[in-house]
Amino acid sequence: MGKLGYIIRCIAHMDYSALFDTVKQVHKLSGKPRAAILADIVSCGFKYGAGYKDYLLCEFYNLNSEQRATFVTRGINNSLVKLLNDSSYYHILDNKTEFYTMFGEYLHRKWLNFAKCSKSEFIDFMQEFDEIICKPDDLCCGEGVDKLKKADFNTLDDMYDELKKRQISIVEEVVKQHPDMNRINPESVNTIRVYTILSEGRANTVYACIRMGNSDRPVDNINAGGMYSPIDMETGRIAFPACDKQRNVYEKHPRSGCVIKGYQIPYWEELMQMCREAALKLPQLGYIGWDVAIAEDGPLFIEANNMPGHDAFPQMPLQAPDKIGFLPTLRQYVKGI
């Protein structure tokens, strides 16, 4: 059923309360009649594969049809995933244990398969560390990730039991990020999301953005309260002030005061090369979003995604002042989208 089937699934599972809330927001922003806005959102869903979140975040209400056709929407991103990625290989990235095993040379930190280890193995592992990061296996967007301190438990037996209750699969050494990355926001490991596309046997780094935490949680994901900003692919400098999912703009990080635009990401060339090299190890997935941390001695992988989100592309008004979306860039590497 292709595109029609996708639209039918979206209609069946849509959050209609959020849809009508979006209509209200756009009405306040644009002054346009609510009925006209709702009709336009529905039309954009059929014509461009745009969801109501796309409509609001990218301000489709201020774009003409030619401009709208240049944006990577939810539907187009899903089509790109379907075109380039073999779903029978998704488990390699979805399952953190499999990912850590296959891409172990790029992790640069100690970790333990907690789901299969014994209590004594866990206790031995913890002799080296005062705190750890713990992760469930198949969740995304930073869900279930936590930092635990050994001192917060009476015994390591108690700590082990608590991790079992949480159904944790991976425990790992805490990444000590590069001082330049820590300066942006010391409360989280601030990662670089790098998008790779395989084309004619070559791995291309097509886009990258920095994701910064903005809460007490040790995660930076924009779906968990974080913010992001595109990075200049040539220089490795942050290209714009940061934005979050509520469309707030940050010239400086609210927790550190660090000026965001123009900030240089360390080890930029090494980071790009690592992602291209890793992409070639898994040619069955031609479109991957890699989450990379920068440690004092270089880049390392946190995780990777076989359905990388399109909401981090440089398509919000601040990032696309010419009102041209990211689709023309992707079409340089992919035919048929």
Identify what each model region corresponds to.
Residues 129-131, 189-193, 205, 287-289, ...:
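Extracellular structured ligand-interaction cores
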Residues 138, 152, 173-175, 196-198, ...:
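Short, flexible loop/turn elements at secondary-structure junctions
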Residues 122, 180-183, 276-279, 288-290:
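Generic recognition of flexible, low-complexity loop/linker segments
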Residues 113-117, 210, 288-291:
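Acidic carboxylate-rich catalytic motifs and surrounding loops in phosphoryl-/glycosyl-chemistry enzymes
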Residues 6, 10-124, 128, 275:
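Conserved N-proximal alpha/beta basic substrate-recognition cap immediately N-terminal to
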Residues 17, 249-276, 280-287, 294-337:
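C-terminal active-site "lid" helix and adjoining low-complexity regulatory extension at the edge
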